[in-house]
């Protein structure tokens, strides 16, 4: 099965399992690390993910993956929380984490409200309105970034 098909099918199965457990899929990675093939899921739920949650998802989804036989050959399967630097992937993430410190990287340089062009924005996430992310920058400016211009966005840990 082609990599894109594996990712699509595993995502579908993972979302079914996670939904039944009151959790969500944050990100799915399927890639080679050295000579080893790795399938890695990052999961989350309201209040945070515990080790028991990761074990339950790993056990339940492993059984389904065995039966479905989607991935041929040996691979390592990991289930983890997204961590303190959780990626923001869906539009709802930008609403859910409003008020938090974020780092956003864009595909191309965009201007903040002072006209300064940049590809990296660090500041307080204000939310999502009409497909655009609003952020109050550390330097005092603000920026409005279209979702389709975001290459990567993560929560930042505040000390």
Swiss-Prot record:
Domain of life, per lineage: Bacteria
Recorded GO cellular component terms are: cytosol
List the InterPro entries: Ribosome_maturation_RimP (IPR003728), RimP_C (IPR028998), RimP_C_sf (IPR036847), RimP_N (IPR028989), RimP_N_sf (IPR035956)
Localization: Cytoplasm
Q: Name one GO biological process term.
A: translation
Question: What does the UniProt keyword field contain?
Answer: Cytoplasm, Ribosome biogenesis
Q: Where this protein primarily resides, as one coarse class? A: cytoplasm
A Pfam family matched in the record: DUF150_C
Chain's role: Required for maturation of 30S ribosomal subunits.
Q: Which family does it belong to?
A: Belongs to the RimP family.
Name the record gives this protein: Ribosome maturation factor RimP
Name the gene for this chain. rimP
């Amino acid at each position: 099965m082609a990599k894109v098909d594996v990712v699509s099918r595993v995502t579908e199965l993972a979302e079914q399992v996670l939904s039944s457990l009151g959790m969500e899929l944050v990100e799915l990675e399927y890639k080679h690390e050295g000579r080893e093939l790795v399938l890695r899921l990052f999961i989350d739920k309201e209040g945070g993910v515990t080790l028991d949650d990761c074990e339950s998802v790993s056990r339940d989804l492993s059984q389904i993956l065995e039966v479905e036989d989607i991935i041929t050959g040996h691979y390592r399967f990991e289930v983890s929380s997204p961590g303190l630097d959780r990626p923001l992937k869906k539009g709802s993430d930008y609403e859910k984490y409003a008020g938090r410190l974020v780092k956003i990287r864009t595909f191309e340089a965009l201007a903040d409200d002072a006209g300064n062009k940049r590809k990296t924005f660090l500041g307080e996430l204000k939310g999502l309105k009409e497909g655009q992310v609003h952020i109050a920058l550390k330097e005092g400016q603000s920026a409005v970034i279209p979702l389709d211009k975001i290459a990567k966005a993560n929560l930042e840990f505040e000390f």
